[in-house]
Amino acid sequence: MDLTQFNTAGIVWPTVAAIAISYILLSSFLSWYRLRHIPGPFLASISSLWNVLNIVTGRTSPVLEKLPGKYGPLVRTGPNYVLTDDAEILRHVNGARSTYPRNGWYEGFKVDEHDHMGSHIDTSVHDAIKSKVIGGYNGKDGIDLEGAIGSQVKTLVSEIRRRHLGQPVDFSRLMRQMALDAITAVAFGEALGFLTAEDGDVFGYVSAVDKMLTYLTLASDLPVVRSVVRSRRMAPAVRCVLAYTGIGRMLNHTRRVVAERYAADDPGKGDMTASFIRKGLTQIECEGESHLQLIAGADTAVTVLRSTLLYIMTTPRVYTRLKAEIKAAVDAGEVVEVITMAQAQRLPYLQAVVLEGFRMRPAVVYGHFKSVPAGGDTLPNGVRLPAGTAIAPNYIALTRRADVYGADVDLFRPERFLDAEPAKRHEMERAMDLNFGLGRWQCAGRNIALMEMNKVFFELLRHFDLQILYPGKAWDEYTGVVYSQHNMWVQITESS
């Protein structure tokens, strides 16, 4: 045996281990030190493990909801992540005059190597694209949002009568199908047919998204994972993996639809794709915006559909009062075959139910991180944040603030918006607006989501009686950045 080699090996490996441990300890210390003045769980201050554990276990919402009560309005949830439930701080960060750019967190929402409005971190590029697409989202440029969404609500009612009356139905799945058909009808002029498909899952898209939800959340939240997965070298591998899933098949379908429109002499009219083409989006940009509509337009709206209907079904006072308001409107001849948004807005209790539904279960749990600009910034509460710090809303805590909504924030009580004095109602509604973002960052699909909620709630309770089958376990729920619910079993009968 060569003793020289033995001794060298005996020295090298302990040295390597010591250097590695020292590097980890130093990195952890520097991570902690930079934002040491922001309270939060200790593990979150030195690593991303705290956040990973919440995402993997699917308990993000209940954990984040309790943070302000323990740590205050600013809470550190990662080495460089800060969440807040303070409305004034959020208006400062996201307001029209803010210089806070998007954080790299947004890049996690790319579905292929191309960006879209939801993943661009360059503010000027984001603004340029939004200026071209916002008309479509708002129902301008000849787009019939009322007709597109209304037709899918009619399909929902007819499919319930055809297949689901008098027997248990997984309402979480039914609402997902409704949301997907509504957004594809708006986007492409024709729904993909999730509601009418025998298995309710066109291309296997729904099951693929469910299986990949945890991964997609981690890819957005963890900078290391995000940088690897979204790198140019990994793009072919990601594309290859997606090609064999329902997500890949859905993306290929949207690419074909968009390509056919660009190849035609006339892009068509009446849907958002035609509007995007007329406004000057390139084919690649239009594909990206179509992908964004599927991601953001269905998987967020469906949370509010499911949860609000669950709260309605399990709160007899609300169920009875809302049914009575709907019946009175129908009997008085105040509504057409499918209620319009203008007609819905004249029903005060329905509007209060929609607001309270968004409050109890916001479409997003947390996220939409912005970066503190160069030179750092002092927040309205006097706290200084160094440049590059990522700060975002803690949405679930924001909607449960007792000083804004009253001591009974955990109770589903739409009356809080009706009984409040005008100044208090204005304060509550202004705080609710933060769920959709502000200024240039405001959710482009806000009007579509509100229209869908109003039409679905009204028409379902107009035609049917709904009863939750297992009130002791109404659903199975996972929460990461967004909510995901399954096994929400409901019995549906014709309205009595």
From Swiss-Prot:
SUPFAM superfamilies: Cytochrome P450. Keywords: Alkaloid metabolism, Glycoprotein, Heme, Iron, Membrane, Metal-binding, Monooxygenase, Oxidoreductase, Transmembrane, Transmembrane helix. Disruption phenotype: Leads to elevated levels of N-methylloline (NML) and lacks N-formylloline (NFL). Its EC number is 1.-.-.-. Pathway: Alkaloid biosynthesis. It is found in: Membrane. InterPro entries: Cyt_P450, Cyt_P450_E_grp-I, Cyt_P450_sf, Cytochrome_P450_monoxygenase. GO terms for cellular component: membrane. Its main location: membrane. This is Cytochrome P450 monooxygenase lolP1. It comes from Epichloe uncinata.
